Structure formats: structure tokens, C-alpha cells
């Protein structure tokens, strides 16, 4: 692991662990069909078996938007050229942060599983997201994100 890589756990004062030495970011891509791209997380991953956004650890000096777009490209084949950032939402715990980047995709595309972190990738209609077993932190954030779409 290079010194610039953020791939490491951060432990909070209460013992809770968070992925990303420099924080983390995820991309919530929104299709022209009003669907969001979700990732079914591999069983071995943190909160495995749940659905959430492609995302991961930020690198040192990397912006949250750049990290979210990079992670989505790595994990789901999301083409950055099709994205227009709509807004960001930040959970800042003081010692660790997670930024959700919400971006419109100018056209529908087929996501591609390109690493072992995903069991499946799926465009999910916004009104059906709650039907899935969601990553607990995404489940907490989803109502506010949905209302802003």
C-alpha cells in the first residue's frame, strides 16, 4: 500500500471502525429513467450482502468527488464522461467523513462488475430502493437523498 492510499481502517472513540484513512466517498448515479445504480456487496466485505453505492476510501489529497468517481469506475465501470454532479452530502464525524456524490448520468449505461467487491450491480427505480436490504449507513441516508433527487 502506498503512503498516498487511504486503504485502511479508522477507529472512532467508541471503537467503531470506518474504512478510509482520509475518509471515504461513494457515487449515487441517477439515470435518465430515474433509477439509481446500486451495488450488492460481496459477503466478505463490510456489511456484506447489503446494497449500497459504489464507493470507497479516498486517497491522500484526493477530492471526495474525484474519489467517488474513481471508485465507481473501478467497481462498476461507471463512465465519468457521462456524469454531471448534482450535489454532495457529507457525514462528518470529526475524525472521519463520508461524502455521497449524487450525479446525473446523461444516458443509461450497463454497469460492469470489475472487481470482487460486488455480487451484482443494478439500476433500481428510486421508488423500489427501500425493497432491498440496504447497507445500514446508506439506509440512514437514503430518505434525505431520495427527497433531494
Outline where the language-model segments fall:
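Conserved Nudix-box catalytic region and its N-terminal flanking loop in Nudix hydrolases
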Residues: 31-74
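Active-site-adjacent beta-strand/loop module that shapes the phosphate/pyrophosphate-binding cleft
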Residues: 31, 89-115, 122-128, 143-145, ...
Amino acid at each position: 500500500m502506498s503512503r498516498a492510499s487511504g486503504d485502511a481502517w479508522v477507529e472512532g472513540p467508541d471503537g467503531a471502525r470506518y474504512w478510509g484513512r482520509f475518509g471515504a466517498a461513494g457515487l449515487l448515479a441517477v439515470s435518465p429513467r430515474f433509477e439509481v445504480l446500486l451495488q450488492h456487496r460481496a459477503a466478505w466485505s463490510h456489511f456484506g450482502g447489503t446494497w449500497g453505492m459504489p464507493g470507497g476510501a479516498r486517497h491522500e489529497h484526493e477530492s471526495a468527488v474525484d474519489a467517488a468517481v474513481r471508485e465507481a469506475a473501478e467497481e462498476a465501470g461507471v463512465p465519468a464522461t457521462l456524469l454531471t454532479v448534482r450535489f454532495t452530502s457529507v457525514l462528518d464525524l470529526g475524525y472521519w467523513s463520508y461524502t455521497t456524490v449524487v450525479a446525473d448520468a446523461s444516458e443509461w449505461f450497463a454497469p460492469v462488475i470489475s472487481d470482487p467487491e460486488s455480487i451484482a450491480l443494478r439500476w433500481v427505480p428510486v421508488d423500489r430502493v427501500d425493497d432491498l436490504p440496504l447497507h445500514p449507513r446508506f439506509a440512514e441516508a437514503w430518505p434525505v437523498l431520495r427527497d433531494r433527487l
